[in-house]
Amino acid sequence: MLKSISLALALFGLGALPAAAQEYKIAVIGLLHSHVWSHLPEMAKGKTAKLVGIAETVPELVAEARRVAGDGVPIYSDYKKMLDEQKPDIVWSFVENNRHREIVEACAPRKIHVIFEKPLAASYKDALAIRDLANKYGIQVMCNYQMAWWPANFAAKKEVDAGSVGRVWRLRGIVGHGGPGSTGTGKYFFDWLTDPDKNGAGALMDFGCYNALWALWYLGQPESVYAEATHLRPETFPKVEDSSTLMLHWKNAEGVFEGSWDLPRSFQDLEVFGLTGSVYMTQQKVELRKRQASEVAMEPLPPERADPIAFMVDAIRGKKPIDGMTALDINVGVVEIIEAAKESVRTGRAVKLPLPK
């Protein structure tokens, strides 16, 4: 009798744990990217996935991680040892951009899914290699942007897709602030962010990737990229540009995007122009602008799309690809645009897309 009841429960799924109760494990590789400190406290709570390890070798960063995450989370100096001992389902990597490929080379054969902070890679060659590895081993690779979890981004896109401004012909974006901090734990971030090899560029990479992502999300791959870079504060940023402008061209559209470490306050603003109006977006609000401006309602995102770990876990659980702004393909395209922009800065000429692979 008991055997038949157990069989019935199994057949109807009543004896299994609900999907939400299935535990996923996440590990952190590297603490050199300052964004880690805004995510680590939530990871330590284990709401969506259990934090099973952190890998870092810099003593000051290790001490800060221990303070934030607690003594119960093991900290490793060898990230590959951590992967083999803890066997995480997901790795969130906060290393230099030029090490992203290395991390995927370690994680992909172990069937570990990966989250990176933007951009996907420091070079187009590495971005292509990351995609090839992800496809070969069947893992998810997600590229995290702060703005990917803003209701404003989705409200603006929904308004444009509904035809509220007519055919889109122009994008104008500005992203930036007064420059990266260089004190406390931030000094380690500053050191590699201002290194053209480790970052891939300066402000052009740091903020150009946001603008390139917007461009692709709204209009797809441009036909050409022209870029200019400015070195306004060589005493602070001796190796890289601290301000840049991208000019993207499509058959019947254009985009003008600014990214800078020299602004008096923080900006992450986009305006999408159509033939009958525009949509203006910041993190806090979205406006439909015609002769007069009207505020567009912003709906809360569903829980599985409200933060990076929840989104990754939902994709793994549902065996569905990461989509939208954090998807792998669109972020390969982002790095391609930045690569073209760097070539344009070097030559002073527009660069046609697609780039040779």
Predicted regions and their residues:
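Bacterial N-terminal signal peptides
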Residues: 6-16
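N-terminal Rossmann-like dinucleotide-binding module
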Residues: 20-69
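Hydrophobic residues in well-ordered beta-strands that form the structural core
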Residues: 28, 77, 116, 141-143, ...
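Predominantly a Rossmann-like dinucleotide-binding segment in NAD(P)-dependent oxidoreductases
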Residues: 34, 147-237, 348
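Beta-loop-alpha module in the N-terminal Rossmann-like domain of NAD(P)-dependent dehydrogenases
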Residues: 58-61, 71-133
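C-terminal helix-rich "cap/oligomerization" subdomain common to oxidoreductases
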Residues: 90-92, 314-357
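Rossmann-fold dehydrogenase core element
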Residues: 129-147, 167-169
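Contiguous beta-strand/loop segments that form the cofactor/metal-binding neighborhood of enzyme cores
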Residues: 212-285, 309-321, 340, 357
